[in-house]
Amino acid sequence: MKKLLLILCCITLLAACQKVVVEQEEPVFIPEPTELVVGTLYGPQIYFTSGQGDSGYDYEMAERFAKYLNLKLKMRAFANISELYAAMRSGEIDIIAAGLGDTPARREQFRVGPPLYRVDQVLVYRQGTPVPKNINSLNGEITVITDSSFVDTLTDLQKSNPDLVWNQEKDKDAEELLTMIAAGDIPYTIADSTSLDINRRFMPELREGLVLKKKQPVVWLLPANNSDKLMSQLLAFWHIEKRSGTLAHLNEKYFAHVKRFDYVDTRAFIRAIDNKLPKYQSTFEKYAGDIDWRKLAATAYQESHWNPNARSPTGVRGLMMLTLPTAKQVGIKNRLDPYQSIQGGAKYLNSMLERLPESIPDSQRMWFALASYNIGLGHVEDARKLAQTQGLNPSAWRDVKSVLPLLQKRKYYKKTRYGYARGNEAVHYVDSIRRYYDTLVWIDNQNMLLELKKENIQMAENLEQKTEAAQPQQP
């Protein structure tokens, strides 16, 4: 019996010493992202597409951020702010980059990135509409976009003005509301100052009224949860772009030149696009070379308002206002022949581009070339050297633009090689051409959208006809 108990004990001990294998679940593999999905809205300062590619302040920054992260950029445009919010909450997009202002309501829902630029919130009305003296007199007459920062502003104002009411549009964007103002369909709206400045080039009837909020930061929005890594990457990227001057460059590119506004000139330009441009457009396209033909056309308008017989007391003549020596240099015999003038002006402008230093980036070479076209390459080189002595970047248009007016002051031009120049006029000259160019691009895009709409309608009609033809005839 003792022997049997001993055997049983040994068996029990051996069993206890056996290795116990516990099956473990394999860790879930989460692949690294390959693309940055950015939610946005269409708008001239935010994101838009054209025959020249994608553009917009938010688009360019998103493109640079994706490159910084070594990811492929995917832009997703939504119909309204509400859809953007829903896409962020459902995880469809990584970031909202849509020109949205920093507000307490947005901070409650999302994480807010660093400021890209600042805007004023302004009341907008149509020329001829009574000028409002205060917000209290506009009960029920203001229309704004649902979920916009303007709703927050009006809500704050309502606390001290309980009777204040307004209308909200969910399915329209800022540009559509401004178009409705210009058409007289609604009396008042609220817009960002940058949006108003940009759209007044196409809708000169727009007028700026009361400033309801000053210097509101425009920011990107990130998900409220699980976005620590992305936020730290965005902050690091923002500091790099700020130090390198990218933010300042984009501000100058999209906003600086549109601040000057001339109602009469804008109306005249829009009329000239209809009445004069069609006669010369094919010639601009033919001789533009590496230049966007619309920049060449904008330059010609700045020079002569597309008047082939234009003359100046200084001796410049024709559509492109060429001097006699320049005409000889580019092989033009008759400066008053509009087609020869366009050919000569294009050739001369292209030569200016070729002669610029390679250090000037492609995105800014045209502005340097136009300034050279206006006051001469030598004076532009003087301005570049002057910028460098002041610790500025001689290859950045925003910096050279700031010192060009100094060439009119003896204190500065006496130290330059080429002396006095009307640098302030060169700045105005380039800014005007940029505004004209932007207007031509906008009108081109509108025409393209109109043609696309017509094609879609025609396709739908053709499909309907085919469907009807395919149906069996009833006996």
Curated annotation (Swiss-Prot):
UniProt GO molecular function: peptidoglycan lytic transglycosylase activity
Keyword field contains Cell wall biogenesis/degradation: yes
Signal peptide start and end residues: 1-15
Catalytic reactions on record: Exolytic cleavage of the (1->4)-beta-glycosidic linkage between N-acetylmuramic acid (MurNAc) and N-acetylglucosamine (GlcNAc) residues in peptidoglycan, from either the reducing or the non-reducing ends of the peptidoglycan chains, with concomitant formation of a 1,6-anhydrobond in the MurNAc residue
UniProt-annotated location(s): Cell outer membrane
A biological process from GO: peptidoglycan catabolic process
Keyword annotations from UniProtKB, A to Z: Cell outer membrane, Cell wall biogenesis/degradation, Lyase, Membrane, Signal
Domain of life, per lineage: Bacteria
Enzyme class: lyase
Membrane topology: Peripheral membrane protein
EC numbers for this chain: 4.2.2.n1
Active site: 303
SUPFAM superfamilies: Lysozyme-like, Periplasmic binding protein-like II
A Gene Ontology cellular-component term: cell outer membrane
InterPro entries per UniProt: Lysozyme-like_dom_sf (IPR023346), MltF (IPR023703), Solute-binding_3/MltF_N (IPR001638), Transglycosylase_SLT_dom_1 (IPR008258)
Major place of residence: membrane
Cited function: Murein-degrading enzyme that degrades murein glycan strands and insoluble, high-molecular weight murein sacculi, with the concomitant formation of a 1,6-anhydromuramoyl product. Lytic transglycosylases (LTs) play an integral role in the metabolism of the peptidoglycan (PG) sacculus. Their lytic action creates space within the PG sacculus to allow for its expansion as well as for the insertion of various structures such as secretion systems and flagella.
Similarity-based family: In the N-terminal section; belongs to the bacterial solute-binding protein 3 family. In the C-terminal section; belongs to the transglycosylase Slt family.
Recorded domain comment: The N-terminal domain does not have lytic activity and probably modulates enzymatic activity. The C-terminal domain is the catalytic active domain.
HAMAP family membership: MltF
Protein name stated in the entry: Membrane-bound lytic murein transglycosylase F
